[in-house]
Amino acid sequence: MQSPTLLTFDLPPESRAMSVPFPQRRFSRVSRTQMVRFPDSALAWLQDLAHLTPTDFSLKDEVRNTQSHHLDSAWTSGTVKLRQKPVSFVSAGYSEPLKLLEDIEQDKVPPGEATESKADDMDITTVDVNLNVSAEAVIEKTTLVELDSAAKGKMVLSNSTSQDNPSSETPQEQAQDLFFFDVSGDKAIRDKHRAVHPPPLVPIRKPSLAESDSSEEVILFRGRAGNAKTVPQSNFVVRNGVATNTTTAITPTGDKTKPTAAEETSLRDDPEVIPVAREKRAGRQRSRSKASKIPKTDEDDEEDAILADYIANMSANPEDDFISDQLRSFNNRRDLGGDNFALNLGSGDENDMPVVEDLSGDEQQAESSGSGLSDADEDNGDENDEADEDDDMDADMDDEGLARLLAKQEELGLGSDELVLIPESFGVSKRGAKKGGQKRATPSSFAKSANASSVADAFDDLDLADWTVPVPRKRRSKQPPNFNISDSEIEAKLKLDWSRDRERKKERKLARESLRGQGLLDKNASPDDLRVKYPVGLRLEDFKTELVAFLISSDERLEFPPLDKHGRMVLHQLALKFNVKSQSTGKGTTRRPVLYRSKRTITFKPHQITEATRQVDGAARRVGRKYFPRADVAGPRGDTPRDGFRGSAHVSVKALVLREGEVVGASAPELGQENKGRAMLEKMGWSKGMALGALENKGILEPVAQVVKKSKAGLGRT
């Protein structure tokens, strides 16, 4: 409890004017639970003090006191920043709105009834002065006012809970020095005073007549034991001229110990009842045997409270009785000295043989009751329920799962007489548990498993290969697989299709390797890239086509594949005639020309493609070279067939010469309707799908395939 607070100020003897002697306090309410003691010299002053009203202390006085209090504080000094100041929280006290309501109801009682009810209590006179500034703080504090004529006109206010020593003065001196002024006891005197000095009207909020909405309702959670805090309250009671000090404790209690309204009224009005302070907190006393035990931390208490709330909520649901019973047994085990983290739900570990789910209701009741049953009774019960347990296990496992487990046991070298490897989802067989010698689930059996030892023995007998040695992968044969088909024609066709598929895969692999070397296998690679579009080289027609597309489009940049020095020069000359900026970038075989659009570049609309093509053809008319191979593609150089134009050029024969195993003419397109030979055959009655020859002598439907062979030569070479 806090120490007493003393407030001392000078009171001039000659001053009889009405003033407030408390510069930072304000009288808010006066009750009849405390006492004021004063000598003869201050009687007139206290009479004026008793008739104080809240309006005597104006806002001007409040501003003056506040300004003088905060003028030289650290907040306005400027030496300390606001963010560096600590934040101190001041408690507003313990609120008791019910007592305020009782006082309001008592004020409404007629004066006659109040005089009769207080006739027997005139010997006890108490005055309560509330010194709390906050309106929410309604804790009644003890205020003892001592006025001594020998103290040179000084007044001391003491807030204390210590008892006065009645033996220090004689009864005659006490009778001469003590005077009591009842402010609220006599209703008639107070009504007369109010008629002369009416108190200010305080507006009272009327209850709303509208029905409350469920969305605006506030549900208060009472919480746990944290709210059961006592607030000490000191009351000075004077009986027969002797002042005594008693301390009461405000303790919220449950519904079972809460007294009724009639009992509270009778106890409050009874003058013989004096509240007695409880010096010790209510709680369970610990025995000396548990004094040496390690105290529980706050986290443990919080976990216990959470678990207690969970059990209370689960107990309301009848479907969760089993879980509630198990959790209740868990709490009992912890109280008996068990581990705080040991949760025993009646089942063992995942490798243990006994399972709670496999037990019947009678067996669970027998185990939970803890009654002493003989081993013979347990054996008889196990033998009677053995068939039922096996049926339940067989029902849980389907045929597919059982076959898989049996196959796994055969791989491990185990017999199929007893099922050993059983997963958790299928439950656990009790037959193996009884054969292993376990009749009851004991703590020692939780750490051992008969199945684990059986599996370990089975693995010890196995001759496993050395897994550290890498197993070489079987190389795929280049020969076609054996299809094992009786029909030779179908088998030959399958082998031919297989070989063609292998060739196509090989070609795609070579193409990917080429593109990977050029960096064209990126995720952002565009199929319109000229390096992808022309993997081998470009013709003069390709130059003109790409230049026309660049002039019509709105692209700012066009990059060509790597070309030799003469090819780059030809492209620069064509670009210069249309005011297109051209520049070569890269080194060695990767040097390539790049075209850039400028402000002076001649542009064409999409509908002007004919005009653009005509101008580009006129600009490339004097170019004698017709083919421009890529400089970054390596390959043998040879003579190229003449295409009817002047001049010749040496190009890469990689795109013109067939590879090993390719079929000649396999990629040749079908002859169209404009072909003269096909038109002549169609006039003679031939159509697609018909064989050539007479009706009796049909020719072949498929042409004779010619496969390129370079590795071997001569007859009989395959």
Swiss-Prot record:
CDD domains in alphabetical order: R3H_G-patch
Name of protein: Protein SQS1
Locations listed in the record: Cytoplasm; Nucleus
SUPFAM superfamilies: R3H domain
Family as reported in the entry's similarity comment: Belongs to the SQS1 family.
Assigned keywords, A-Z: Cytoplasm, mRNA processing, mRNA splicing, Nucleus
Composition bias type Acidic residues, residue spans: 375-400
Originating species: Podospora anserina (Pleurage anserina)
Highest taxon above the source species: Eukaryota
Function in brief: May be involved in splicing.
Domain G-patch: 673-718
Molecular function in Gene Ontology: nucleic acid binding
Keyword rRNA processing: no
GO cellular component: a single term: nucleus
Bias type Polar residues, positions: 442-452
GO biological process: mRNA processing; RNA splicing
Compositional bias segments (type: Basic residues): 283-293
Chief place of localization: cytoplasm
Location of the R3H domain: 537-599
Chain positions covered by the region annotation Disordered: 247-301, 341-404, 430-452
